[in-house]
Design a protein with these regions (language model features):
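Short, charged N-terminal beta->alpha structural module
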Residues: 5-42
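N-terminal small/polar loop signature for handling phosphorylated ligands or for N-terminal nucleophile
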Residues: 32-67
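Short, acidic/turn-prone active-site loops that include or flank metal/cofactor-
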Residues: 36-39, 75-79, 219-221
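A basic- and aromatic-enriched beta-loop-alpha substructure that forms the phosphate/nucleotide-
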Residues: 56-109
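Internal, active-site/partner-interface "lid" segment
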Residues: 97-155
Length: 252
């Protein structure tokens, strides 16, 4: 397959997606970037799709049939066993990742534990996490609301930490609470569990994953979440009420 015919479609922005875009542009690849958020859909790029070129969709939900020549790049949900997206793109193009790109890959693949495992320094971890939050669009107000959420809305059930978030940007909360074994963060329109046996928990909700109402990633002990605005508040409350006893009774 001719690498020069690839047309890259960028998904929701975070530090990894920014890094992918930078790497592609440095290598003079054709990139389409609509600066989408998490949960980005292939249909956003309908205006560029055709049956001649090979399109590479990066972390895009396939809400429409993909074009005739299409490569899907992702490492979430059913693709959670794969390398990070930036690593997959590097392999596709025969590019060797530098230290910064390796840190970005580890962060996106397995959060802080994966960076620690690859030998990242505390300063490198702090830098990557700050840049990732910024790339996600987290504002100073979000950071302050995260602190307020922890200060005023944190509770525990056995070894489970539960936070009622005042900001939809949950990573501003997770970064402040790390290290943790089991963390559940929720708001009026979304919910995410981080920690022990997250992939196994996701397995109990596969019908929601298949309907794109839920997602998971980050390995066995990564995360499982309900997509923002994917269900009614009372439905979300029911899932939270089901999750808490499950999570508090997890065995190691």
């Amino acid at each position: 397959m001719n690498r020069n015919r690839y047309r890259f479609l960028l998904g929701g922005h975070d530090l990894e997606m920014n890094g992918i875009g930078k790497m592609l542009r440095q290598n003079r690849k054709i990139v389409y970037d609509l600066h989408l958020s998490w949960g980005a859909r292939l249909s956003s790029y309908t205006y560029v799709l055709n049956s001649e070129d090979t399109f590479v969709g990066i972390e895009l939900t396939e809400d429409i049939p993909p074009p005739a020549h299409y490569i899907a790049i992702d490492h979430h949900n059913e693709n959670s066993h794969k390398a990070s997206s930036i690593e997959q793109i590097a392999e596709l193009l025969g590019i060797k990742l530098n230290r910064e790109q390796q840190l970005i890959a580890a962060n996106d693949r397995g959060y802080i534990p994966a960076m620690i495992e690859m030998g990242a320094t505390p300063d490198e971890i702090t830098d990557i996490r700050c840049r990732d939050r910024e790339a996600q669009g987290i504002t100073e107000e979000d950071e302050l609301l995260a602190e307020q959420s922890i200060r005023e809305n944190l509770s525990t059930e056995k070894d489970l930490i539960i936070v009622n978030a005042l900001t939809p940007r949950f990573s501003a909360i997770t970064d402040r609470l790390f290290p943790f074994e089991k963390l559940l963060i929720y708001s009026n329109d979304s919910l995410t569990y981080y920690g022990r046996q997250a992939k196994a928990i996701a397995g109990l909700f596969m019908p929601l994953v298949e309907k794109h109402k839920a997602y998971y990633g980050g390995g066995e002990n990564g995360f499982f979440g309900i997509a923002q605005n994917s269900m009614l508040p009372e439905e979300l409350q029911q899932i939270k009420n089901k999750l808490i006893p499950l999570l508090t009774n997890l065995t190691k």
